Design a protein with these regions (language model features):
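Flexible cytoplasmic inter-helical loops of multi-pass small-molecule transporters
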Residues: 132-154, 347
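Cytoplasmic helix-loop-helix junction between adjacent transmembrane helices
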Residues: 52-87, 281
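Central cavity-lining transmembrane alpha-helices of secondary-active solute carriers
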Residues: 1-12, 205-217
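Extracytoplasmic gate region of multi-pass secondary transporters
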Residues: 157-215
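Helix-loop-helix hairpin linking two adjacent transmembrane segments in secondary transporters
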Residues: 89-135
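A late C-terminal transmembrane helix in Major Facilitator Superfamily
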Residues: 93, 282-314
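Structural signature of the two symmetry-related core transmembrane helices
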Residues: 22-36, 229-243
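Hydrophobic core of transmembrane alpha-helices in multi-pass small-molecule transporters
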Residues: 45-61, 253-267
């Protein structure tokens, strides 16, 4: 995971320089190779290579390519476009586990990976061709309102020196690192709270529904009010969810706990792309998004390690939640202090 995030910083920025269709074919091919590699695993070394390719091409480059392209070529309806794109991902997260579980009952797991790889090669290039065949590098700026408004197009080297980027990133990274820790160590939460073994699994239905519904609400609100004005509210439901985890013991509270995380996740998915485009322009959005996506991937690894370390040091789930909530609160306060400065630079 860590290695894939480092590679993503360099490879991800190339989307600014290449034709979208060709870049998409590259990412699709890489994903097909990674899934096929899983079908041939016979050693720890091969497993490492397969996971590296999967994390890089799947979680990293596929989402990076989609969100970057939408952020660049949509302006007035960017929020709705991003929410529609993320809806596809959320739908897959809901349907694919069920599909794979069923497939495991009728065939060997290696054959499943081969089928996935072949399906990727057969269908995704065709879909990509019809979706972005007319999108060229030359069409990027001509009729884009950002260009007409003479908004500064920030390079990545400039963005990383901007204090606003650091503060926004602190808020953006709360979801991936804390939520990943919660999801990975859900058995620890079940044990600590004396909840039934299926409590969190059932609560995930509420999480999924809340996340998907919030996607579309967020998309509409972004187009109406801008990402910059909504950003301050993104992690408030998440903070409340941690307070629920700290102070409530009833199994019913898990539905509110994960439901509120779903609300913040829905907002974070859309705001995580649209905010950078609004604030820093779209000319170099690929390199900027490559950095933020890499940070997201890195933070998921950090979250797993952090929660594991805290558990090893005998921290309770309430104490871990307090630390996590403290992080969210501090990042929210910092964001509140600069909320009036979250405007693009006009040339």
């Amino acid at each position: 995971t860590l290695l894939s995030s480092i590679i993503l910083i360099w490879v991800g920025k190339k989307i600014d320089d290449f034709d979208v269709l060709k870049f998409s074919f590259f990412v699709i091919s890489l994903l097909a190779i990674s899934t096929f590699t899983f079908s041939k695993i016979n050693s720890i070394t091969f497993l490492f290579i397969a996971i590296l390719l999967m994390r890089f091409s799947g979680q990293g480059m596929m989402s990076h390519t989609a969100s970057t392209t939408i952020s660049r070529y949509f302006t007035n309806t960017r929020g709705k476009a991003l929410s529609t794109g993320w809806f596809g991902l959320s739908t897959a997260e809901f349907l694919m586990p069920v599909t794979i579980i069923y497939a495991l009952t009728i065939m060997d797991w290696r054959n499943i990976w081969i089928i996935i790889s072949v399906s990727i090669i057969l269908f995704l290039p065709l879909v990509s061709y019809f979706l972005v065949k007319e999108v060229k590098l030359s069409s990027r700026e001509d009729d884009n309102e950002v260009a007409k408004e003479n908004i500064k197009q920030w390079k990545r080297s400039e963005v990383i020196k901007d204090y606003r980027f650091i503060i926004i990133a602190l808020n953006m990274l709360a979801m991936p690192w804390i939520a990943t820790g919660i999801f990975v160590y859900q058995s620890f939460i079940l044990s600590a709270k004396n909840w039934g073994e299926y409590t969190i699994a059932q609560s995930f239905m509420v999480y999924s529904i809340a996340s998907v519904l919030t996607l579309f609400v967020a998309g509409y609100l972004i187009d109406k009010f801008t990402s910059r004005k909504l950003l301050i509210y993104m992690n408030i439901p998440f903070l409340i969810s941690l307070l629920i985890l700290i102070y409530f013991q009833s199994p019913v509270s898990s539905f509110f706990f994960l439901g509120l995380i779903g609300v913040s996740n829905g907002f974070a998915n859309v705001l995580g792309s649209s905010t950078w485009a609004e604030l820093y322009g779209v000319k170099f959005i690929g390199s900027i998004k490559a950095l933020t996506t890499a940070l997201m991937v890195f933070s998921t690894a950090f979250g797993t390690a952090f929660f594991g370390l805290m558990i090893d040091f005998d921290f309770s789930i309430e104490q871990i939640s307090m630390i996590s909530g403290g992080y969210i609160l501090i990042s929210l306060i910092l964001l509140f202090l600069i909320k009036n400065k979250l405007n693009p630079t006009i040339l």
